[in-house]
């Protein structure tokens, strides 16, 4: 086993990377509230794992979506547990994200030189909210249907471009198969990809600049 480790160590300098990670200075004022971002990340990883598991059974069509969710909850092995964990971690992710944003704002973590860290964090917060909106529609139940109908109907109040925006969001004049397809694609591919990209921008900046000082 040591020979395998030595082979990788010679080429990748694994020990140096590990030392850099474990020896990072943590300011004495840091408390549990500074862990909210990490908890949000953990919830996101749980979401990815459980969401991926459900894609094996979920069918994104208006005629089969609700039945496929019922199948996950009643027939698929541990489906009820996977979907429940997905829902619970989704709620936890939103809550932790909100608390994290408030903590950063109240402790002045958005100030120079961390402006870009703040901007990427705000984008991640918007993406988190978008996960909630798109995911809510996927079971194709009454609550999800009317929630999506109301949310996608909000831009209609905008003069001139309101109606085209609504049709762009829904895929048609009304909430239907095109809407479900759009939201499923956003929820399972576009939003996770964008979230991963902005996380890869967000975390290195935190690593480089360190944790902000106390007020």
Curated annotation (Swiss-Prot):
Q: Which residues cross the membrane?
A: 32-52, 90-110, 116-136, 186-206
Amino-acid positions noted as binding heme c in the UniProt annotation, renumbered to this chain: 35
Q: Give its localization.
A: Plastid, Chloroplast thylakoid membrane
Binding residues for heme b 2:
86, 187
How does the protein's chain sit in the membrane according to the entry? Multi-pass membrane protein
* One cellular component term from this protein's GO annotations in UniProt: chloroplast thylakoid membrane
> What are the GO BP annotations of this UniProt entry?
photosynthesis; respiratory electron transport chain
Query: Which top-level group of life is the source organism from?
Result: Eukaryota
Q: Which UniProt keywords apply?
A: Chloroplast, Electron transport, Heme, Iron, Membrane, Metal-binding, Photosynthesis, Plastid, Thylakoid, Transmembrane, Transmembrane helix, Transport
Q: How is the cofactor bound?
A: Binds 2 heme b groups non-covalently with two histidine residues as axial ligands. Binds one heme group covalently by a single cysteine link with no axial amino acid ligand. This heme was named heme ci.
The answer on whether this UniProt entry bears the keyword Amino-acid biosynthesis reads no
Q: What is its main location?
A: plastid
The UniProt entry, under InterPro entries, shows: Cyt_b/b6_N, Cyt_B6_PetB, Cytb/b6-like_sf, Cytochrome_b_N_euk/bac, Di-haem_cyt_TM
| Entry-linked Gene3D superfamilies | Cytochrome Bc1 Complex, Chain C
Q: Which residues bind heme b 1?
A: 100, 202
Gene Ontology MF terms: electron transporter, transferring electrons within cytochrome b6/f complex of photosystem II activity; metal ion binding; oxidoreductase activity
Q: Which cofactor does it need?
A: heme b; heme c
Q: Which family does it belong to?
A: Belongs to the cytochrome b family. PetB subfamily.
Q: How does it assemble?
A: The 4 large subunits of the cytochrome b6-f complex are cytochrome b6, subunit IV (17 kDa polypeptide, PetD), cytochrome f and the Rieske protein, while the 4 small subunits are PetG, PetL, PetM and PetN. The complex functions as a dimer.
* More about this protein: Heme 1 (or BH or b566) is high-potential and absorbs at about 566 nm, and heme 2 (or BL or b562) is low-potential and absorbs at about 562 nm.
Described function: Component of the cytochrome b6-f complex, which mediates electron transfer between photosystem II (PSII) and photosystem I (PSI), cyclic electron flow around PSI, and state transitions.
Q: What is the protein's name according to its record?
A: Cytochrome b6
The gene is petB
């Amino acid at each position: 086993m040591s020979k395998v480790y030595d082979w990788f160590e010679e080429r990748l300098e694994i020990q140096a990377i590990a030392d850099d990670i474990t020896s990072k200075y943590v300011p004495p004022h840091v408390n549990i509230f500074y862990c909210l971002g990490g908890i949000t990340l953990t919830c996101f990883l749980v979401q990815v794992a459980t969401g991926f598991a459900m894609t094996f059974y979920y069918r994104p069509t208006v005629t089969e979506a609700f039945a496929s969710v019922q199948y996950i909850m009643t027939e698929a092995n541990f489906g009820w547990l996977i979907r429940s964990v997905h829902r619970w971690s989704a709620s936890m992710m939103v809550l932790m994200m909100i608390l994290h944003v408030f903590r950063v704002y109240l402790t002045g973590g958005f100030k120079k030189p961390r402006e870009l860290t703040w901007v990427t964090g705000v984008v991640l917060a918007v993406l988190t909210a978008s996960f909630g909106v798109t995911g809510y529609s996927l079971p194709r139940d009454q609550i999800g249907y009317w929630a999506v109908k109301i949310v996608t109907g909000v831009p209609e109040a905008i003069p001139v471009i309101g109606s085209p925006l609504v049709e762009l969001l829904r895929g048609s004049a009304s909430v239907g198969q095109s809407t479900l397809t759009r939201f499923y694609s956003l929820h399972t591919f576009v939003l996770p990809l964008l979230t991963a990209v902005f996380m890869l921008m967000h975390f290195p900046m935190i690593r480089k600049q360190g944790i902000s000082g106390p007020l």
